Amino acid sequence: MSSQPNKNLKVFDNPNIERNFIIQINMPEFTCLCPKTGQPDFATLYLEYIADKVCIELKSLKMYIWSYRSKGEFHEAVTNKILDDLIQISNPRFMRLKAIFNVRGGIYTTIIAEYQQKNWTFKTKIDLQYQG
């Protein structure tokens, strides 16, 4: 198995497909580069999702996240790109990605992007606030 950063996301079968359960993943070491200055940008990513048929395999997610270390991306673009890639590989019932970027020039940036399958609704009110 490779320990090199790569974009090869993997999934496994949802062990409880009949149930809506929330998966929360905290990624405190996200790094990309500012496309204007080339300086590193650091963020904590909070992923929350309700799987449908498959779940995202964590080691592949780690390698995928690491692959952004040398990429120049705006905060808004990289957050939405990551969400798009995760949706494409897993087709979740619901997914939210929150990216909290460290201060840069006295400004903090938080980007929240989310997705919900068509015709799928929460059966009960669910507060998807990460409790990490």
Curated annotation (Swiss-Prot):
Stretches assigned to coiled coil: none
Top-level taxon of origin: Bacteria
GO-annotated molecular function: preQ1 synthase activity
Active-site residues per Swiss-Prot or TrEMBL entry: C34 (thioimide intermediate), D41 (proton donor)
EC number assigned by the record: 1.7.1.13
Broadest EC class assigned to this enzyme: oxidoreductase
Protein keywords: Cytoplasm, NADP, Oxidoreductase, Queuosine biosynthesis
Chief localisation class: cytoplasm
Pathway of action: tRNA modification; tRNA-queuosine biosynthesis
Binding site residues for substrate: I56, E57, L58, H75, E76
Pfam family, one: QueF
Signal peptide: none
Enzymatic reactions: 7-aminomethyl-7-carbaguanine + 2 NADP(+) = 7-cyano-7-deazaguanine + 2 NADPH + 3 H(+)
InterPro entries from the UniProt entry: GTP-CH-I_C/QueF, NADPH_dep_7-cyano-7-deazaG_red, QueF, QueF_type1
Entry function: Catalyzes the NADPH-dependent reduction of 7-cyano-7-deazaguanine (preQ0) to 7-aminomethyl-7-deazaguanine (preQ1).
Family from the record: Belongs to the GTP cyclohydrolase I family. QueF type 1 subfamily.
The name this protein goes by in its record: NADPH-dependent 7-cyano-7-deazaguanine reductase
Organism: Vesicomyosocius okutanii subsp. Calyptogena okutanii (strain HA)
Organism taxonomic ancestry: Bacteria, Pseudomonadati, Pseudomonadota, Gammaproteobacteria, Candidatus Pseudothioglobaceae
Gene behind this protein: queF
